[in-house]
Amino acid sequence: APRWCSEETRMADEKKYKKPVPRIDEESKGFWEACQRHELYVQKCRACGTWRYYPRALCPACLSADTEWVLSSGRGTVYTYTVTYQNLAPGFRDELPYVLAYVELNEGVRLLTNIVGCAPQDVKIGMPVEGTFDDVTPELTLPKFKPAVS
């Protein structure tokens, strides 16, 4: 914010979400709308039964456009991960270190996401996780995962 703006305006600007945001299109709109309701939906092909993520118009297995959105269990395991200790990009450096992971949902699809709610050194491949949601702006909610409670 410019030096001449009010202290209140400067503080409001500092609280704005600074990370890149996803581009929401027709194929992904249902996914992001569900996230705003704190629900994790994934696509399933009605023709062949293939679950898929990322959202898209055609099934990668059979090329059918006959798709439905299905509520996921929100549970899965850490497929692989990395711990980021250094990132100078705005919005990221304040959260260091953070865990970026592929989570394999019980439905069989993998999402690139963050693991939260535990120390980075506690994350392990195969670790059971469950979904949680981060309302980063009034218009955007990100799905994240935390260690599963038995």
Language-model segments: which ranges?
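Short functional micro-motifs and their immediate structural scaffolds
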Residues: 53, 66-68
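A broadly conserved sequence feature marking short terminus-proximal activation segments
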Residues: 7, 11-40, 150
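Short, basic/aromatic beta-hairpin or loop at an interaction surface
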Residues: 95-111
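Residues immediately within or flanking Cys/His clusters that coordinate Zn2+
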Residues: 39-42, 56
